[in-house]
Curated annotation (Swiss-Prot):
Residues 305-339 are annotated as: V3. Residues 701-858 are cytoplasmic. The gene is env. This is Envelope glycoprotein gp160. Some of the most genetically diverse regions of the viral genome are present in Env. They are called variable regions 1 through 5 (V1 through V5). Coreceptor usage of gp120 is determined mainly by the primary structure of the third variable region (V3) in the outer domain of gp120. Binding to CCR5 involves a region adjacent in addition to V3. One of its GO terms (biological process) is virion attachment to host cell. The keyword RNA-binding does not apply. Residues 1-19 form the signal peptide.
């Protein structure tokens, strides 16, 4: 019976062990998480200053479609934020500020410039008052005479002001007077009532540091793309309905680099963008009404700006080592005003913008496009907000867009806008900084393709909607790169399996994997976990090969640019991208090594799975979906794996220590003699302690028998208890009192009797506990025996029924076989008889013919 119980316990333990799931580490699974690592850029502009900012572009980039769902946000996006920051640095690099012009914070005596003759002013005022509306409000093109002569209606001369100021610097304690011509918008003047003189200062003189370029540089836009470092990837939402915010984009592609983009610095409009399509679509902020509207390229919208060139540039030596570039005009002559004109089907494009806005799911205003209008920002804003601000070959233009807004609303016919130039501008990225740009000689002209509109959508009571132009330059890059997101490849995954470490794994069919470089690793991201895990070995090799390939490509381009990387911001980013990839791979291998899984694609462990209710669906769930469910368990799993590995290393160390005793020569090793001496001392101490224990036990045993040790107290100090024993007392009492046949009076020391009493009580307690435990075990055994007998009888009965059923089925099959055999035999015999008769009949035909012939002849 005990053997049967032991077998049942072993079977239950085996079932428990078999049902326990253990943590299995997979290396090479297609999973990722959001990342903020710096990107590096690549460009094909090899002949401009931008080539020292980015690496050469080889155009060898591919995209792989993923069967996954991912969240995208153009405004909460590290790719767009890096683009905004980097373009700002490119902008700063292009003008290279180096000289602080703080000496110009001096009082200047200024007077406004006048025309050379009074005829210009008269003709100007006359033309303003006497021209017909047809002449004033005409739409111009390339062939319009006023466009070629820069004298279209409404365009005048740039407002300038002549100033004089004194500076000390070239000669000690000697002042020198300088004459300078400023744009009137770059100075602020105040009138002294006591002297009736006008004193002017440079604008923003006391609030910012103004810098001038050491050399004259143009802000030439460059086209470039961002690339992810090895070990990282870029995901793109390929859904045409994507509007800047999509929590569940189901059309996702993976790539190593973005599309080409162009550096843009302008307000109101975006120029030369790469996202223009044959449709109009809107990117809308997820929490407010900020939008960026991509215009339909079908309408061929463009902007042509021009500044007539009738000024020269001269150098003014302010003090030793400080040179100031001043724009010099002939006396009493002001420069012509800059202006821009709009080409293309602008009215049709703006009407399509209104219709697209009315259909947008985020829009809650009126659907009547007649009540949707374009509006300028409110008055009192910064010049970059109130005017359209753009850069034309180094000069910053501030264009008054009132005529343009009236033109697209069919209120006027002027498709051009007057502009003025400022030398001191507000920066578009960092608030409160001003950059001084030197003037330029000659005529300036620039042509740009208009691809987007920066605007805020405002509506009230479903009656009127305003599309207000905005000065958020950063929105341009959210349109360019807002459908991308940067992710870090996390090839280490955890999943529960029944295999334990050192157990044999089930055989798996080997599947081939097409090596597609680094992105080939992500090709199985949309596959089920089971299918992806079958190719995990090949995927890990593809991952490593892709990282090495990207490292080599990056190293090659860095080598080609090593001379130009000394003074650029991008150089450090490129080198950081290379170092980051190596660190990431080493970090993954370090984690695997801490778990005892170094350089293993599938690693079984002895750590039990922490949550039995959480199990993967190997046939229908992707690794990315599974990773999202177990991400909160990764810290605990990692800690448990590290502890298990530490314990494993300790066990291996102890095992190696035991293995050292297998060699007989190690017993006589000199390094072991100290241990031998230590063991001898411990043995001696143990023997002495054992002797002490034995002596104490013997002493207690003598005390129990009534003896006193030699060093005990004198008898007079021990109180004696007189115990009278009755001779008629039962024999069992005599036996209990150690015989009792001696009779008479006996004297017991009362401490010894008390000890005997305690010992008897302890014996009774232990006896009772023993009896209770024995009864409990016996009853449990009887209960288990009864259950076992009933289970055995039930199994025996079911086995008998099954055996009887099998015998009955066997007999039925045998009977069916006999019947079939007899039926087939009878059928064969009957068929044989029929065939035999037919054969005999055929054989008898000649005989019958002969007999008939004989009868006929007779």
């Amino acid at each position: 019976m005990m053997n049967q119980l032991l077998i049942a316990i072993l079977l239950a333990s085996a079932c428990l062990v078999y049902c326990t799931q253990y943590v299995t580490v997979f290396y090479g699974v297609p999973t990722w998480k959001n990342a903020t690592i710096p990107l590096f850029c690549a460009t094909r502009n090899r002949d401009t200053w931008g080539t020292i900012q980015c690496l050469p572009d080889n155009d060898d980039y591919q995209e792989i479609t993923l069967n996954v769902t991912e969240a995208f946000d153009a405004w909460n996006n590290t790719v767009t934020e890096q683009a905004i920051e980097d373009v700002w640095h490119l902008f700063e690099t292009s003008i290279k500020p180096c000289v602080k012009l703080t000496p110009l914070c001096v009082a200047m005596k200024c007077s406004s410039t006048e025309s050379s003759t009074g005829n210009n002013t008269t003709s100007k005022s006359t033309s303003t008052t006497t021209t017909t509306p047809t002449d004033q409000e005409q739409e111009i093109s390339e062939d319009t005479p006023c466009a070629r002569a820069d004298n279209c209606s409404g365009l005048g001369e740039e407002e300038t002001i002549n100033c004089q100021f004194n500076m000390t610097g070239l000669e000690r304690d000697k002042k020198k007077q300088y004459n300078e011509t400023w744009y009137s918008k770059d100075v602020v003047c105040e009138t002294n009532n006591s002297t009736n003189q006008t004193q002017c200062y440079m604008n923003h003189c006391n609030t910012s540091v103004i810098t001038e370029s050491c050399d004259k540089h143009y802000w030439d836009a460059i086209r470039f793309r961002y690339c992810a470092p090895p070990g990282y990837a870029l995901l793109r939402c390929n859904d045409t309905n994507y509007s800047g915010f999509a929590p569940n984009c189901s059309k996702v592609v993976a790539s190593t680099c973005t599309r080409m983009m162009e550096t843009q610095t302008s307000t109101w409009f975006g120029f030369n963008g790469t996202r223009a399509e044959n449709r109009t679509y809107i990117y809308w902020h997820g929490r407010d009404n900020r939008t960026i509207i991509s215009l339909n390229k079908y309408y061929n919208l463009s902007l042509h700006c021009k500044r007539p060139g009738n000024k020269t540039v001269k150098q003014i030596m302010l003090m030793s080592g400080h040179v100031f570039h001043s724009h010099y005009q002939p006396i009493n002559k002001r420069p012509r005003q800059a202006w821009c004109w709009f080409k293309g089907k602008w009215k049709d494009a703006m009407q399509e913008v209104k219709e697209t806005l009315a259909k947008h799911p985020r829009y809650r205003g009126t659907n009547d496009t007649r009540n949707i209008s374009f509006a300028a920002p409110g008055k009192g804003s910064d010049p970059e907000v109130a005017y359209m601000w753009t850069n034309c070959r180094g000069e910053f233009l501030y264009c008054n867009m009132t005529w343009f807004l009236n033109w697209i609303e069919n209120k006027t016919h002027r498709n051009y806008a007057p502009c003025h130039i400022k030398q001191i501008i507000n920066t578009w990225h960092k608030v409160g900084r001003n950059v001084y740009l030197p003037p330029r000689e000659g005529e300036l002209s620039c042509n740009s393709t208009v691809t987007s509109i920066i605007a805020n959508i405002d509506w009230q009571n479903n009656n009127q909607t305003n599309i207000t132009f905005s000065a958020e330059v950063a929105e341009l890059y959210r349109l360019e790169l807002g459908d991308y997101k940067l992710v870090e490849i996390t090839p280490i995954g955890f999943a529960p399996t029944k295999e334990k470490r050192y157990s044999s794994a089930h055989g798996r069919h080997t599947r081939g994997v097409f090596v597609l470089g680094f992105l080939g690793f992500l090709a199985t991201a949309g596959s089920a976990m089971g299918a992806a895990s079958l190719t995990v070995s090949a995927q890990s090799r593809t991952l490593l090969a892709g990282i090495v390939q990207q490292q080599q490509q990056l190293l090659d381009v860095v080598k080609r640019q090593q001379e130009l990387l000394r003074l650029t911001v991008w150089g450090t980013k490129n080198l950081q991208a290379r170092v980051t990839a190596i660190e990431k791979y080493l970090q993954d291998q370090a984690r695997l090594n801490s778990w005892g899984c170094a350089f293993r694609q599938v690693c079984h462990t002895t750590v039990p799975w922490v949550n039995d209710s959480l199990a993967p669906d190997w046939d229908n769930m992707t690794w990315q979906e599974w990773e999202k469910q177990v991400r909160y368990l990764e810290a605990n799993i990692s800690k448990s794996l590290e502890q298990a590995q530490i314990q494993q290393e300790k066990n291996m160390y102890e095992l190696q220590k035991l293995n050292s005793w297998d060699i007989f020569g190690n017993w006589f090793d000199l390094t072991s003699w100290v241990k031998y001496i230590q063991y001898g001392v411990l043995i001696i101490v143990a023997v002495i302690a054992l002797r002490i224990v034995i002596y104490v036990v013997q002493m207690l045993s003598r005390l129990r028998k009534g003896y006193r040790p030699v060093f005990s107290s004198p008898p007079g100090y021990i109180q004696q208890i007189h115990i009278h024993k009755d001779r008629g007392q039962p024999a069992n009492e005599e036996t209990e009192e150690d015989g009792g046949s001696n009779g008479g009076d006996r004297y017991w020391p009362w401490p010894i009797a008390y000890i005997h009493f305690l010992i008897r009580q302890l014996i009774r307690l232990l006896t009772r506990l023993y009896s209770i435990c024995r009864d409990l075990l016996s009853r449990s055994f009887l209960t288990l025996q009864l259950i076992y007998q009933n289970l055995r009888d039930w199994l025996r009965l079911r086995t008998a029924f099954l055996q009887y059923g099998c015998e009955w089925i066997q007999e039925a099959f045998q009977a069916a076989a006999r019947a079939t055999r007899e039926t087939l035999a009878g059928a064969c015999r009957g068929l044989w008889r029929v065939l035999e008769r037919i054969g005999r009949g055929i054989l008898a035909v000649p005989r019958r013919i002969r007999q008939g012939a004989e009868i006929a002849l007779l």
